[in-house]
Design a protein with these regions (language model features):
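Transmembrane alpha-helical segments and their cytosolic interface motifs
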Residues: 111-129, 206-231
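Hydrophobic alpha-helical segments characteristic of transmembrane helices
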Residues: 90-142, 146, 150-172
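Juxtamembrane "helix exit" motif at the C-terminal ends of alpha-helical transmembrane segments
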Residues: 82-83, 123-146, 221-246, 260
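Membrane interface segments of multi-pass transport proteins and intramembrane proteases
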Residues: 99-110, 137-153, 233-246, 265-275, ...
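Divalent-cation
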Residues: 1-88
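Cytosolic juxtamembrane amphipathic/interface segments immediately preceding
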Residues: 5-13, 18-19, 52-59, 100-116, ...
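Polar-ligand-bearing catalytic/cofactor-coordination segments
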Residues: 2-19, 23-25, 95, 145, ...
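Hydrophobic alpha-helical membrane-embedded segments
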Residues: 60-82, 153-178, 252-268
Length: 317
């Protein structure tokens, strides 16, 4: 009897990010922002310029993960600012002293780049504070007698903080809508990968959890950091808190790089092993994705259509 051929599942490299009442989609050639503003759909399409295309060394394994992560953060912050401009909190509100200082001292043409840099540094500082400094100080209160036990305690604290942070975010009304757009983004990508026409009817029943999601990536970063710390700290002066913090900062680059390569591997294969490996990150998406309404799906479809390459297969994962 002839063996039945297993149909190869298409996986796209197109990915996205939920915005304020909108979605950012990134394809192999360009990125598109689509926002459902009060006056209707607003779109912004840009050619995708990657720094690793200019400097090939930045495309090497491990290094490319760090570069991609930082590039995604910068582009994501810019896209969030773009979408936020259509939904001011209070038009009648007086500008803050900080806003007035910026207007006076910062040239208009440099304003956005400075604001993006400030937002990026603030985001990185928040991540380091919540998921590195806080767990390190709290774990020190347990006075563990071995590096392994200390790392396990610290790792458990990191995971609890991560889950708690996502849970609290998901309870906010405005964030709940952002997470609905996140679900719409995932559903649209699944529909496209299945080879179905991009219609609301086809997108709606698709899963809202996707194995190549940024939530999964961040969770795996935490897990990899725990594993790497368990291998490194038994051989150094791990009881000195400042040594621990310094070493962790140095390990951030390989941790992010290894996580990126892990996600690429898991995203490229669909079998029992990769499904088990991706299961914890998929579960985390219960906090960061919600079922979207049809209007949100329409936004995701429009964003997807704008970045699908003309050359078939160019966006193969």
């Amino acid at each position: 009897m002839a063996k039945r051929e297993k149909k190869e599942t298409f996986r796209t490299s197109i990915g996205g990010q939920a915005l304020i009442e909108g979605i950012l989609m990134r394809g192999p050639e360009k990125q598109a922002i689509v926002v459902r503003a009060p006056e209707g759909l607003v779109t912004k399409v840009e050619e995708l310029k990657l720094v690793r295309d200019k400097y090939p060394i930045l495309g090497l394994p491990i290094i490319r993960g760090v570069v991609t992560f930082l590039d995604s953060m910068v582009k994501g912050i810019k896209a969030l600012m773009f979408s936020a401009d259509y939904f001011p909190d209070d038009e009648a509100a007086q500008p803050s002293k900080f806003d007035l200082w910026l207007e006076k001292h910062v040239p208009a043409e440099k304003f956005q780049s400075i604001l993006v840099t400030f937002s990026l540094l603030l985001s990185l500082a928040l991540c380091l504070g919540l998921f590195m400094l806080l767990p390190t100080f709290v774990a020190g209160l347990f006075h563990a007698q071995s590096a392994l036990v200390h790392n396990l305690i610290e790792g458990a604290i990191k995971i609890l903080i991560f889950i708690g942070y996502l849970f609290l975010c998901s309870r906010q009304k405005d964030v709940h809508r952002v997470f609905q757009y996140h679900g719409a983004e995932h559903k649209t990508i699944f529909c496209y990968e299945a080879g179905l026409p991009l219609t609301v009817e086809n997108v709606r029943p698709q899963p809202k959890h996707h194995p190549r999601c940024g939530t999964s990536f961040l969770f795996v970063v935490i897990i990899v950091s725990i594993l790497v710390s368990s291998l490194v700290f038994p051989y150094i002066n791990w009881q000195n808190i400042w040594v621990r913090i310094g070493v962790k900062l140095l390990l951030l680059i390989p941790v992010v790089g290894v996580t990126y390569e892990f996600n690429r591997f898991v995203g490229a294969h669909d079998n029992a092993v990769t499904r088990i490996l991706s299961a914890p990150g998929m579960w985390m998406q219960n906090f960061t994705t919600n079922e979207p309404d049809d209007s949100m799906i329409e936004v995701a479809i429009e964003a997807m259509k704008l970045v699908i390459p003309a050359e078939k297969g160019k966006d193969q994962w």
